[in-house]
Design a protein with these regions (language model features):
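Conserved RecA-like P-loop NTPase helicase motor core
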Residues: 95-101, 107-284
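Conserved helicase/translocase motor-coupling segment
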Residues: 1-99, 162-191
Length: 284
C-alpha cells in the first residue's frame, strides 16, 4: 500500500514538473525553442519547486516510517524498555498555516495536517501564471511582467489551467500525517513525553476527535521530568527541544529502564544527529 501511495505522489510531482515547464513557455518566460527570456523568474520558480519537493518527500518518508516505528515501540515497551525518538521537524508551521486558513467553525481532521499543504502553497504562491512581455534593454531582449491598463499583472489562462490541473491531482491523493503526530496519537500524550519547540499541537480525544492544545514555555521541562521520573515510557524530542537535556538512565533518575533510541529523522547535519544520540548514552 505504501509503495502505491509513494508512486502516486511521485506521479503528481512528475505532473507538476511537466506543467511547470509548459507554464514557463505559456507565460513567455521561455520562448518556443526553450530559451529563457527571464532567467531570474525561471530560476525563482524552479528553485522554489526543488526545495518544496525535497521538503515534502522528507516529510512523506518520515510519515510512512511511523507505522513500523510504532509497532517496534509497542514491542520495546512491552519488554520493559524506555523509548526515545529523535526527530528534526515538528510540522508546527504547517499546522499554524492550516489553522489560519480554516473557518472557525470547521472541524480539524487528519487530512488537513499533511505536508501536502507545502506543495499546495507553492502552487498557489510561486507557480508561474503571470504573462511576460519582451522588452529591449541595452540592446538585449528580456522579459518582464505584463500589466493591464490598471497596472494589474496579467494572468496566462493556459498557465493557470496547468497549475489547477497539478493541484487537483495532488489533492486527490491520500494524506500522510507527520510521524510526530502519528506517534502521539497512537500512544496518547499521557504515555508520550514531547520535548520539542512547538507551541501548539494536535491531539486526539477519547472519541478520536482532533483538538489543539497549547504548550507553555515550561512544557519541555515538565515532560522531561515525567520521563525521567518514570511517569512516561516514551519520549520524543527535536533539535529545538533537546538542547541541554539528557534522557539516559542517570543514577539520579527514577526511570532506570534501558533506553531504546530511534533516530527517526537524522536531518541534514550529521553532528547534530550524533549529538542527539548522545542524549541517551551517558556514563553517569
Amino acid at each position: 500500500a505504501q509503495i502505491g501511495i509513494y508512486d502516486a505522489y511521485a506521479g503528481a510531482f512528475r505532473t507538476i514538473h511537466h506543467n511547470l515547464e509548459a507554464a514557463l513557455t505559456a507565460t513567455g518566460v521561455n520562448d518556443a525553442s526553450g530559451q529563457t527570456n527571464a532567467s531570474a523568474a525561471k530560476a525563482s520558480a524552479k528553485s522554489r519547486f526543488e526545495s518544496t519537493k525535497q521538503r515534502f518527500f522528507n516529510h512523506l518518508l518520515m510519515g510512512m516510517k511511523a507505522s513500523t516505528v510504532i509497532r517496534a515501540i509497542e514491542d520495546d515497551v512491552a519488554e520493559g524498555f524506555a523509548c526515545v525518538i529523535q526527530v528534526v521537524s515538528t510540522g508546527e508551521s504547517l499546522l499554524k498555516h492550516r489553522l489560519e486558513a480554516m473557518d472557525p467553525e470547521d472541524e480539524l481532521v487528519e487530512g488537513a495536517l499533511t505536508p501536502r499543504d507545502y506543495v499546495l502553497s507553492y502552487l498557489e504562491q510561486a507557480f508561474p501564471i503571470h504573462a511576460q512581455k519582451l522588452v529591449e534593454i541595452d540592446g538585449n531582449m528580456v522579459a518582464e511582467p505584463l500589466r493591464d491598463a490598471n497596472g494589474t499583472l496579467v494572468v496566462s489562462r493556459e498557465a493557470e489551467a496547468l497549475r489547477d490541473e497539478a493541484m487537483m491531482e495532488l489533492m486527490s491523493l491520500a494524506p500522510i500525517p507527520s510521524a510526530l503526530d502519528q506517534i502521539l496519537w497512537a500512544f496518547g500524550d499521557e504515555v508520550v513525553a514531547e520535548v520539542t519547540g512547538r507551541s501548539i499541537r494536535p491531539l486526539k480525544s477519547s472519541d478520536g476527535a482532533l483538538f489543539i492544545e497549547k504548550r507553555s514555555a515550561s512544557s519541555n521541562s515538565s515532560e522531561t521530568r515525567a520521563f525521567m521520573e518514570g511517569e512516561k515510557d516514551i519520549l520524543i524530542f527535536s533539535d529545538a527541544g533537546g538542547t541541554g537535556r539528557s534522557y539516559h538512565a542517570a543514577q539520579t533518575a527514577k526511570n532506570q529502564k534501558r533506553r531504546r533510541h530511534y533516530l527517526l529523522e537524522p536531518g541534514w547535519r550529521a553532528d547534530a544527529a550524533i549529538q542527539g544520540l548522545g542524549r541517551t548514552h551517558r556514563s553517569a
